[in-house]
């Protein structure tokens, strides 16, 4: 068993390094965490600096089926409008995605990963466990901003950080968070960690 320790403050990544990384393929990633804790920001940083392709589970679900399910009920005119309003109906979205994945817990995840490196924002514990069982993801990353932001209600999110290979704290500034994200991104693109155990990156 490999024990990974990451000291973010001592890892320096230059612009030229990150530009070169855009030509290197990412492993398949799952980004987890409570609402508004920085999951999309994590993926956006890796996209902009290292070429990661990603799609949030909510955006994919809106495009694939939730817009059609809810457009009459809430008067949505586009999938984008449906997606933007998800914050007002999180429990309903949770139930719809759970139903969509009822016969295959990894159904939505596999659809997203057909054209992306990363799935952002899975919310159901059974779906995470189903994806782990099928080996859908190479690494799972948890983004944690719990020192400055509230946790999410259990009726729309029932996952905890115990599933993660990496736990990344986001309780400081955006600049600090960006350094941590780039450090982990560099490790994931250039090294292999076949038996990583969960660690806290702070």
Regions found by a protein language model. Give the residues of each.
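Hydrophobic anchor at the beta1->P-loop junction of P-loop NTPases
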Residues: 31
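P-loop (Walker A) phosphate-binding loop of NTP-binding proteins
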Residues: 34
